[in-house]
Amino acid sequence: AEPLAIRIGGINIADGSANFADFSLRPPFVTAIQSLNGDIGVLSNREQKAASVNIAGKVDQYAPVSIKGSLTPFDPLQSLDIATSFRQVELTTLTPYSGKFAGYRIRKGRLNLDLHYRIEQGRLNAENKVVLEQLQLGEKVDSPDAVDLPVRLAVALLKDSKGTISIELPVQGNLNDPEFSVMPIVWQTLRNLVVRAAQAPFKFIAGLVGGSNVDLSTVPFAAGSTEL
């Protein structure tokens, strides 16, 4: 028998709200999107036509968020084109994640995030643009999941003259492949970025001493000595 035909002429959202909580973290991560307004186009399981999406709201009452694009609602892997943007999100709210994965609390900072995800027949092409403004790390947190990298040094080196960190994280892959997962790719890219940033000063020093091929990613010296 054929599945039940479903057709919704459209959805309108007026002054709505959505809550998100991740209780796998200690402390838990909890946030809310308020003042949700917008609309979603025709939803039908009999038509392969994409439904339009245009929604806007505010994270924790003040940080604007928008979701725009289109998707096939009953088979999003067939076709999806969604752009999401977050502006001026307070970074301290992300401390549960920074504590677990970076090993530090966040003292202050703002996040601007632009995500553009496109899917055609299961093939993902994603662009993730992250801008961190005036990020300051707080006290160290003991976490078995934290990266074993000089995070404070990397943050300092990645900042430009205005104290801004800009990162682009493209992701591509086949979502029909059970071995493919987006987040491990994102975390590995971030890890590589931190490693390169932390090694940059030593490579710069190597260039000053004649551009030799000597590996200066670590520089040994005697305890108490002022000579390298």
Task: Give, region by region, the residue ranges found by the protein language model.
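Extended terminal
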Residues: 4, 72-74, 78, 84-85, ...
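Elongated, acidic membrane-bridging lipid-handling scaffolds
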Residues: 1-93, 171-175, 183-187
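Amphipathic hydrophobic-ligand
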Residues: 25-39, 58-68, 89-124, 148-149, ...
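Broad hydrophobic/π-residue packing in well-ordered secondary structure
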Residues: 20, 97, 220-223
